[in-house]
């Protein structure tokens, strides 16, 4: 079963929007709230595939999905549900 992880800041509107999509789909995820924690942000960047320091950053089964726009793009393309099917 894939593990869904999301790195966020508490009041980030893009983080809230990404979590809303996952919540609507009934996905259980691990959230890492990294407000102001540069060590945690560096760890997030090291895991990612594109070096982005922005939040949110989303991982499904260890694979870097990207940010909020990337998550919604997968949804529009019909590619998100297959990724989440075994995670739900």
Question: Predicted segment positions?
Answer:
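Short amphipathic alpha-helix with an adjacent loop that forms part of the alpha/beta core around
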Residues: 43-48
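Thiol-based oxidoreductase modules, predominantly thioredoxin-like and allied folds used
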Residues: 28-41
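Non-catalytic, surface beta->alpha helical segment in thiol-disulfide oxidoreductase systems
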Residues: 60-87
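Compositionally biased, disordered extreme N-termini, encompassing classical targeting presequences
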Residues: 1-3, 85-88
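Short Asp/Glu-rich motifs
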Residues: 41-42, 77
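Structural micro-motif
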Residues: 49-59, 68-69
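Local sequence-structure signature of Cys/Sec-based thiol-disulfide redox active-site neighborhoods
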Residues: 1-31
